[in-house]
Amino acid sequence: MLFGKHKQVVKRILIVEDEPLTAFDNENILGDAGYEIVATTDHFDNALEIIKRQPVDLILSDIRLRSQHNGIELARAAKARGIPTLFATGHAYPGAADVAVGCLMKPYTERQLLKAIECVDRHLQGDSVKSPKGLELFAAAGEEN
C-alpha cells in the first residue's frame, strides 16, 4: 500500500463545452494529465447519447450548451445513471447543487482545473476535501440534498 495515495475513481471524462477554445484546452490539459477523454461535445443530445453508450466517470460540463437543453438537464440525466457532473461555468445557477458534485467558476487556470478534478475524485470517495479557489463542492453523488 502506498501511503498518501488514493485510488483514483475519476479516469474517464466527458467534456461538454460550447466554447471551442475552452473545450480544446480542457481536452488537452486533462488528456496530458492522464485522464481518458471519452469525448468532447457542445450539444446536449450528443452528450446524452455518449453517457448511454460508454462508461464515463465524470462529466465536466458548462451549463450553457448549443441546444435547447442545458447542463443542468444533462447533469440530472447523468445523476440518474450514477454519473457525477462538475460544472465549469461563469455564472452560478439555482438548482446546480441538486444535480452536480460541484462547480468550478470560469475563468480558471490549468492548475485550478486539475486540482478541481483531483478534489472531486477524493470527494466522491468520501474524503473531507478543502476546495481550492474557484471550486465549490456540493453533496457527493448518491447523497440526497
Can you annotate each of these PLM segments?
Residues 93-101:
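Short loop/helix-cap segments at secondary-structure boundaries that form the rim of catalytic
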Residues 61-79:
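Conserved phosphotransfer microenvironments
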Residues 27, 40-58, 66:
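Acidic, metal-coordinating helix/loop segments flanking the phosphotransfer/catalytic sites
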Residues 1-12, 110-145:
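Non-catalytic signal-transmission and effector/linker regions of two-component phosphorelay proteins
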Residues 106:
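A Lys-centered signature of the CheY-like receiver
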Residues 52-54, 77-83:
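Conserved phosphotransfer cores of two-component systems
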Residues 19-39:
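Two-component/phosphorelay signaling modules centered on CheY-like receiver
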